[in-house]
Amino acid sequence: MYFILRNLKLTYIFHSGFAVEIHSCILVFDYWMDPTICLPEILSKGKPVYVFASHFHGDHFSREIFAWRKLYPNIPFVYILSRDIVRHHGCHRDEADILMVKGDGWCDKIIKVIAAGSNDSGVSWIVEVEGKRIFHAGDLNNWYARFLIPKT
């Protein structure tokens, strides 16, 4: 399933995973699995790919992302990960290009990234690219539903 808004294509991958396609690059957030097999078509477009993982939980991070560099050798990949992924042994420091914690910022010629807070593990992401600001919440949740259940 995807939506196109003002030169931005947003594709739902699975769970908290999304891909954002814009003119200059592709952003992939919190990849876990791809049951509809939509990513090969997205990743094969020849654009730089920025891969974000908000935290170490298995439903927000998969080591499978590191294989993409070998599967698509002519495409530049930048892995931007929450530092807790290394701390919890999800990956080695040298596998990530950028490691971030809440409050960190990073940019290159294409994107600007800020790691914001989460009320669960890791971070949420604010990404600025081509005059657009994109927010991915990671595991950020207001947990409002617990207040809807009457106490017994």
Task: State what each model feature region is.
Residues S121-T152:
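Internal alpha/beta domain cores that form substrate/cofactor-binding pockets in large enzymes
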Residues Y2, G17-W68, L140-T152:
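Pre-active-site segment of Zn-dependent metallo-hydrolases
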Residues Y2-R6, N74-K132:
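Metallo-beta-lactamase
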Residues H15-G17, G122:
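Conserved positions at the start
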Residues K9-Y12, I26-D30, I110-S118, R133-D139:
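Active-site-proximal beta-strand elements of phosphoester/diester hydrolases
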Residues Y12-I13, E21-I22, C107, E128-V129:
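Generic beta-strand structural signal
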Residues V51, Y79, F135-H136:
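Structural beta-sheet core signal
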